[in-house]
A protein has these predicted regions:
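Classical secretory targeting signals
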Residues: 1-28, 121-155
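Low-complexity segments
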Residues: 29-118
Length: 155
């Protein structure tokens, strides 16, 4: 009886481990880039998700940036580079929740604090930029349209 229990426990653990891996990766696929689900950061009262990517096709370790959503600015998802510690652009959604495009900040306009970036520094939304550090000009995937609620969690 114990060996059967151990086999069931092993299957449950393996299933739980695989459930955290994206679908194609479960089948031995390759993900050049992907976004995690949203998390809430109560100290600064914003939501964030991580954008993981391989800078090159031969990279073996993911790099990442943060996507930050402020409920007070519900149309935008801001991209933050944790290495340079700067906001470098934002993705805009329309009032209807449909994607409008990406605004890539000029190098001179990238700042550590969003409050230090004037609204006028953001260009009109356009196509997604290349994956950061890429040598093949592969474009970033747009963020999923599953924006967090506009109302902050209680507590």
């Amino acid at each position: 009886m114990l060996p059967m229990f151990k086999r069931i426990a092993l299957l449950v653990v393996a299933g739980a481990a695989l459930s955290g891996v994206p679908g194609d990766a479960q089948a031995g696929g390759y993900y050049r880039q992907y976004y995690t689900s949203w998390s809430y950061y109560s100290t600064t009262r914003y939501y964030y998700r991580t954008y993981y990517y391989y800078p090159t096709t031969v990279s073996t370790t993911y790099s990442y940036h943060y996507c930050i959503y402020y409920p007070s600015q519900p149309r935008y998802v801001y991209y933050y580079n944790p290495v340079s510690q700067q906001y470098w652009g934002r993705f805009e959604f329309g009032e209807d929740g449909k994607p409008k495009g990406y605004s890539l900040l000029a190098e001179k306009d990238r700042k550590e604090k969003l409050a230090d970036i004037p609204e006028s520094a953001f260009p009109k939304p356009a196509a997604m930029p290349a994956i950061p550090g890429t040598n093949d000009n592969e474009k970033m995937e747009a963020p999923p349209a599953d924006l967090p609620p506009k109302d902050l969690p209680k507590g």
